[in-house]
């Protein structure tokens, strides 16, 4: 399904960001340098791309459709996903706070990142392998086409066009700089 494939493609970019974040944490903990823009750039990537672009599509459009099609929120997979979105936002907030005010609190950043990385990896696994499979079973072709159109509309309305390419390139650059 096109709309689900689109969410999975965004997961791929987010997972590459997690890989780079994990390498950066290793460098931070061994007191090695990281790119100067990374302490502020990484939380920005996860807040803007993972949350405002990706999670917003899920929360505002995709999950409500799944609820209409009978997938429960309370006590079900959607409720779990929403809770994990909130926990992830808190981790990103703490990473951002660690790099504010011209000071970089390496320990605070690393601690928040080490909580965030496994949380989001497990979250993506559950969505890709459980929730999206459930969605494919309850969504019609018309639902899929409509959802894909709504994803495009949201990207246009919220000035998110080009965000995939921008952040994919930024993650690739960081990956090259953080060995």
Model-inferred region functions:
Residues 1-179:
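Small-residue-biased structural context
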């Amino acid at each position: 399904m096109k709309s689900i494939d689109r969410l999975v493609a965004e997961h791929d970019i987010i997972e590459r960001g997690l890989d780079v974040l994990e390498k950066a944490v290793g460098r931070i903990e061994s007191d090695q340098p990281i790119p100067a823009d990374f302490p502020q750039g990484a939380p920005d990537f996860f807040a803007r791309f993972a949350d405002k672009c990706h999670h917003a599509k899920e929360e505002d459009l995709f999950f409500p459709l799944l609820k209409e099609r009978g997938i429960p929120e309370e006590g079900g997979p959607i409720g779990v996903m929403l809770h994990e979105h909130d926990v992830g936002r808190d981790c990103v907030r703490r990473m951002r706070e660690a790099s504010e005010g011209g000071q970089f609190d390496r320990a605070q950043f690393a601690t928040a990142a080490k909580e965030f990385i496994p949380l989001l990896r497990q979250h993506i696994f559950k969505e890709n392998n459980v929730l999206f499979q459930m969605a494919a079973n309850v969504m019609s072709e018309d639902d899929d086409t409509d959802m894909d159109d709504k994803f495009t509309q949201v990207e246009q309305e919220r000035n998110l066009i080009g965000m995939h390419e921008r952040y994919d390139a930024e993650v690739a650059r960081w990956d090259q700089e953080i060995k």
